[in-house]
Amino acid sequence: MTRPIAQKESHLRAVRWWLVFMALLIAAMVLVGGATRLTESGLSIVEWKPVTGSLPPLSQAEWIQAFEGYKAIPQYREMNAGMTLDQFKTIFWWEWSHRLLGRFIGIAFLLPFLWFMWRGALPSDLKRRLWIIFGLGGLQGAVGWWMVASGLTERTEVSQYRLATHLVLALLIFTAIVWTLRRLSDRPPTLASIRLRVTSGVLLVLVFVQLYFGALVAGLRAGRVFNTWPDIDGSFIPSADRLFFEQPWWRNLFDNTLTVQFQHRMMAYALFAVAVLHLIDALVSRANPAIVRGALWLALAMTLQATLGILTLLYEVPIMLALVHQGVAIVVLTLAIVQAERMTEGQSARQRQELGVAAG
């Protein structure tokens, strides 16, 4: 009996390392996507060829053909008229690398997944969860093209709505993987008050809302205007006439650069306040040390992220600083996931042992 259990434990350990690798790949994918956006490279490839598109142009004639395709869209005519072929190659390589990494992630997920199923290393509930994650990954590829297509006919950039959808879906997949990874950890259940559980869940939800707002800021280039802090447009809270001049009023939440940047700022303040209150509650209530450490790291990460956001704004979105800001956002999300999951009932070693037997 000991040998089969040990074998299943070995399988689950391999599954955990595979999921760590996948989470790192998705984080890298988000950063490459951010660089692609910041360098205005996302519309350089005007076709979606999931299989044959994995190869870049291999001859001068193919490069010219790809460049001619780019010349046919509004972005070239209105923003990059006169661009040379060498300049086009620079933006092409960013978008091509982003798509290639997406293809690699699909393969890196599917092949080990099939192998683990063949070896009987996955219990049925874990298989279902991983199939859902794989399906979301396929959907993400389609959403990526849906986003790119929005900038090929009339616009000179992709739709901020579709950009935000693309980013949030990627981070939902990331969240599902990290959560699943945590559920495979060997740890006892962590006791926590209802209030701490609620605030940890609220923090995770607010982080996602803030990530969505951040994507809208990126899509509208709203970080390149109103580059002052703590005031915005001359005051801490702009006038309602400026915030809601578009009709219907709700369109301002997505289309008005002032409103979009303002709500991103306000959400940052709200997140920071909730994180600090969560930490104080954990300390005062003498919560489990793991919960206190998680709350502390989350508050510190949010402090760093807020500082980076302010600097990115004041310096008018330099690429490297903006990418660091995006990278720390992933760290904040990871800490929020871990803290929220920590509040749920963990699996004891005995439960994991039973899970391993069930997988057999």
Swiss-Prot record:
- What is the membrane topology noted in the UniProt record heading this document? Multi-pass membrane protein
Q: Which compartments does it reside in? A: Cell membrane
Q: What EC class is this?
A: oxidoreductase
The catalytic activity, as recorded, is: Fe(II)-heme o + 2 A + H2O = Fe(II)-heme a + 2 AH2
Keyword list, A-Z = Cell membrane, Heme biosynthesis, Iron, Membrane, Metal-binding, Oxidoreductase, Transmembrane, Transmembrane helix
Q: Which pathway, per its entry? A: Porphyrin-containing compound metabolism; heme A biosynthesis; heme A from heme O: step 1/1
Q: Which HAMAP family match?
A: HemeA_synth_type2
How this chain assembles, per its entry, is: Interacts with CtaB.
Protein name per its UniProtKB record: Heme A synthase
Q: Supply the source organism for this entry.
A: Nitrobacter winogradskyi (strain ATCC 25391 / DSM 10237 / CIP 104748 / NCIMB 11846 / Nb-255)
